[in-house]
Amino acid sequence: MSESLDNSAINQLIPEIFDQMRHNAARTRDAKKPSAMVEESGSITTQSLLRELETLDKVIATIRSIDSVVKGALPSHMNKIHHVCKSTNKMLDNWINIQSQAGYAHHIMDSRTGSKTGSNSNEEVVEQYKQEIAELQKSIKMEEDKLIPAQVKGNGNGPTGQRLYGNSYRQPTGRVTKATALRNARNRPSGIPQISSRLTRPTASSNLKRQR
């Protein structure tokens, strides 16, 4: 097979591959679109294929240059050959990734999320998102306000801010016991000296001794 036949086969095969990729990505989407939108999408696909063909021509030229370098390389140039092959594989992987992401981006732009804003400007789109964020923040604030009374009730806080420790808590009363009154009297400072010995009444014999 000659080189011209190989190039013609590649030029016919590559557009078919990309067209099939986009057809698979947009199969479910195109069924719901009107005919005018389908025709517009087809024209966009044709333009993108032409751009891809130009880029592929540059890639093919690069591959040919690499092939000529490898053919004239010596065994001592194996490290360079390995580096060239690794770079070429990375370039091809990135190219495939670009094509996949392009189809995915095209799908997102035509999805309901992408067409939600319609023909609105960027400022209107940003304003709509700000309103949605404000509504979400308002809903979160309302939910937090509902949770605060439930937490206060669960902690057992009374209306006066005092915590009730079960049934063991008792309100203080105005009654004072005898032991408390005696303790307070002992602790109260006074000028009367305290006598540690016990006071007893004098007996009749002690009175007679004093009279003598």
Curated annotation (Swiss-Prot):
Keyword field: Cell cycle, Cell division, Centromere, Chromosome, Chromosome partition, Coiled coil, Cytoplasm, Cytoskeleton, Kinetochore, Microtubule, Mitosis, Nucleus
Pfam families with a match to the protein in the record: DASH_Duo1
Annotated GO CC locations: cytoplasm; DASH complex; microtubule; mitotic spindle; spindle pole
Localisation per UniProt entry: Nucleus; Cytoplasm, Cytoskeleton, Spindle pole; Chromosome, Centromere, Kinetochore
Biological process according to GO: attachment of spindle microtubules to kinetochore; cell division; mitotic sister chromatid biorientation; positive regulation of attachment of spindle microtubules to kinetochore; positive regulation of microtubule polymerization; protein transport along microtubule to mitotic spindle pole body
Keyword Cytoplasm recorded: yes
Coiled-coil positions: 118-148
Keyword rRNA processing recorded: no
InterPro entries: DASH_Duo1
Disordered as annotated region, ranges: 150-212
Compositional bias annotation for Polar residues: 193-212
Major localisation: nucleus
Family classification: Belongs to the DASH complex DUO1 family.
Function of the molecule: Component of the DASH complex that connects microtubules with kinetochores and couples microtubule depolymerisation to chromosome movement; it is involved in retrieving kinetochores to the spindle poles before their re-orientation on the spindle in early mitosis and allows microtubule depolymerization to pull chromosomes apart and resist detachment during anaphase.
Quaternary organization: Component of the DASH complex consisting of ASK1, DAD1, DAD2, DAD3, DAD4, DAM1, DUO1, HSK3, SPC19 and SPC34, with a stoichiometry of one copy of each subunit per complex. Multiple DASH complexes oligomerize to form a ring that encircles spindle microtubules and organizes the rod-like NDC80 complexes of the outer kinetochore. DASH complex oligomerization strengthens microtubule attachments. On cytoplasmic microtubules, DASH complexes appear to form patches instead of rings. Within the complex, DAM1 and DUO1 may form the microtubule connections.
Name of the protein this chain belongs to: DASH complex subunit DUO1
GN (gene name): DUO1
